Amino acid sequence: MPHFRLLAMTLLVSLTVVGCAGSQSSTTTSRQPNVVFVLTDDQRWDAISISGHAGPLETPNIDRLGHEGVYFPNAFATTALCSPSRASILTGQYAHAHGVTDNFTEFPADTATWPLVLQQHGYETAYVGKYHMGENNDEPRPGFDYFATHRGQGQYFDTEWRINGGERAVIPGYYTTIVTDLADRWIRGRSAERPWAIMVGHKAPHSFYFPEEKYKDRFSDVQIPYPASAFMLDDKPDWYRDRLPTWHGIYGPLFDYRKQFPDRTPAGVTAFEEMVRSYWRTILSVDDSVGRLYHTLEEIGQLDNTVFIFTSDHGILNGEHGMIDKRTAHEESIRTPLVVRYPGLTAPNAPRVVDRMVLTTDFAPSIVDIAGIEPVAGFKHGRSWKSLAQGQAAADWRTSYVYLYNYERQFPYTPNVRALRQDRYKYIRYPNHTPEHKSELYDLQDDPNELVNLIDEPRQRARVAEMHGELDRELKALGAWPDVMPLDEGIGQELPDAAIR
């Protein structure tokens, strides 16, 4: 351990020297803008206080980006799973197109990404934090001049890091603080004469939730009721109930509060409350991180010449619909927080809310557009939201989007999901029409918590047929896999099978 600590300190000291050597004036230049892209893991759309739905959770630094920029309340993941979503953010493609369809598949090195395109157009680029495409691969990836990451998920304390393919070493401390230190030092080392872009990949708020020491008791006096949908499963597909005692169900072993159904015992409620509190606590540290990077940009005179993006790969179900997971097409799973600060989009004293649907696949075309680079053909499933963020009308903007998830043998608790989400209605279907895989229809305006499945309502038959047909047409246009692929082998065990990762 002393060897690793010495190496870790050497790495951090060397970064500090680079940062000092690259100090610059506080004058913002007129060149292409820098990019700071902060990506959290499993953070729900309502887990930032600017959403108005965060309860006692306050995120003033994240909110500030929206209050001085653009807030997108209707941002969505095309696949609510870590690796596929991260690949979609980089490539502007759905998972079946870029090939990363689970959490153990390597990202294809020959696929264009927005960092690679920026690098090819003169940007200096960096990735710091959780990359999570390739379970045990921490080698540098194409498109990044500087690459600091680790294998797999990393851990909240004392993660083993690898910088630019060098020797692995534990950097002692809390993950969110360390990743911010690394990002801060790299940013301070950049020249004011050359544009740069950095992605900052947080572990938080991914489970298991281990908060920073200073926040470990926050929210302890907050009572948190079970979500209204936790026990309202009668009109849902059978697989909802089948997964209750599994790794991704509220009575499974993941958070160790398996009781009778429904469980309203004091022990069960306390365990649920503490899970949600700890989830929020990890986000407090992320908010601190955003504040640090904001002030760094101020100090080096690059705040107003930087596109500062904050988002997540997808959301998470914290007990809703009886689930502790993402993957599904529920709002808590597919909606993401998204705020963007850049005066080239809107002045800091004239913030804007853009209600249109934007997707993870829109990041790649949007960022290259803002950088003044020609559109990239490979970013084929997304659209630039630059004009929307600037307040321009877009009559032809999407009014619906397709959500896709593909069954995983490693985590066999969710079937293939194909869904069409419109502004008001959502239609979800599974591989077949047995009770186990019963389809779903929700009125998001009257029933935002998706409590009442309207699929069997006679008055909704025409709507179901219409949305079913639209989903078919969109899936064909995307070149997506058939509903029955990959083959669904069903729920075979309550714990994931590590042997087939």
Positions of PLM-derived features:
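Bacterial N-terminal signal peptides that target proteins for export
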Residues: M1-M9
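Bacterial N-terminal signal peptides
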Residues: A8-G19
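Formylglycine-dependent sulfatase
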Residues: C20-S439, P448-G469, R473-K476, D483-M485, ...
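Residues forming the ATP-binding cleft of Hanks-type serine/threonine protein kinase domains
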Residues: Q445
